[in-house]
């Protein structure tokens, strides 16, 4: 069966979840994404073909929706996996003619539901199955019921955060506090200050290190190691403590190692990291 995976969102989280989903189901689907790190070749997902909209395709909603429909018609999948946003990131999948006769499956993670529903105009795809891949809030659980598809809880596989493995390329020093984030420089600096202040409050003198995509942040002191690496699993397994935002993937990966995970939720347009953090603390 020809399968396509639809993950528009731009951030690394969608591609990381794509990798985890394909690992679990042993899939190598077609991929529709707008991730810039995939476009640049810095990340090479195990997918064929990989289809990315260009600048002209993304100039406005109608152009983007036209590209999406054409891309799906070129792939002609029998099944479409829709990541995170059931109507697409802008609502482009609502009433999309190209989805007729295609089995649509939705991967449901936490949404800022009030913000997301403002983007929807029309009818969502007719899903045949919904995978609920994390604990959701009550409002979103009720919304899933309106989609009239069977809901199955699914825990995607992530590398252990407590494997104590050593990387072939990098070995972190003892008592290393690692900051991992794929967001912008302002958010990275917030996490750096969070880690530094935690050490001061506790009277600790750890060795710090940071993982982020791209060049070394200007604010980072010269004696702090910086790694532009994806994925960072081997470093996460070595660190004594991890400092991050509350994105879906890192929270899933650290679920069984929450004692070493320090979380600073960040505002997002369509995600609710604060809700995710609250639900995690209730477990």
Spans of model-derived segments:
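Nucleotide-activated sugar donor-binding and catalytic core shared by glycosyltransferases
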Residues: 1-209, 214-283
């Amino acid at each position: 069966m020809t399968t396509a995976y639809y993950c528009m969102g731009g951030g690394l989280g969608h591609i990381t979840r794509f990798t985890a989903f394909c690992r679990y189901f042993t899939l190598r689907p077609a991929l529709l994404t707008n991730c810039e790190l995939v476009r640049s070749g810095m990340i090479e997902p195990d997918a064929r073909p990989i289809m990315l909209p260009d600048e002209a395709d993304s100039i406005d909603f109608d152009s983007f929706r036209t590209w999406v429909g054409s891309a799906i018609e070129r792939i002609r999948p029998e099944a479409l996996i829709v990541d995170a946003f059931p109507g697409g990131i802008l609502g482009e999948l609502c009433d999309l003619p190209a989805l007729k006769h295609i089995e649509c499956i939705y991967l449901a993670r936490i949404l800022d539901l009030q913000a997301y529903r403002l983007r929807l105009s029309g009818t969502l795809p007719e899903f045949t199955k919904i995978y609920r891949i994390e604990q959701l809030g009550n409002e979103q659980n009720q919304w899933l019921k309106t989609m009239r598809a069977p809901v199955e809880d699914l825990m995607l596989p992530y590398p252990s955060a407590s494997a104590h493995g050593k990387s072939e390329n990098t070995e972190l020093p003892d008592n290393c506090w690692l900051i991992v984030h794929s967001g912008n420089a302002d958010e990275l600096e917030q996490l750096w200050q969070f880690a530094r202040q935690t050490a001061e409050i506790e009277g600790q003198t750890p060795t710090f290190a940071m993982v982020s995509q791209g060049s070394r942040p200007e604010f980072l002191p010269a004696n702090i190691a910086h790694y532009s690496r994806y994925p960072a699993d081997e470093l996460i397994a070595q660190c004594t403590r991890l400092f991050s935002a509350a994105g879906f993937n890192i929270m899933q990966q650290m679920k069984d190692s929450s004692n070493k995970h320090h979380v600073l939720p960040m505002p997002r347009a369509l995600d609710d990291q604060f809700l995710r953090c609250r639900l995690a603390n209730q477990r």
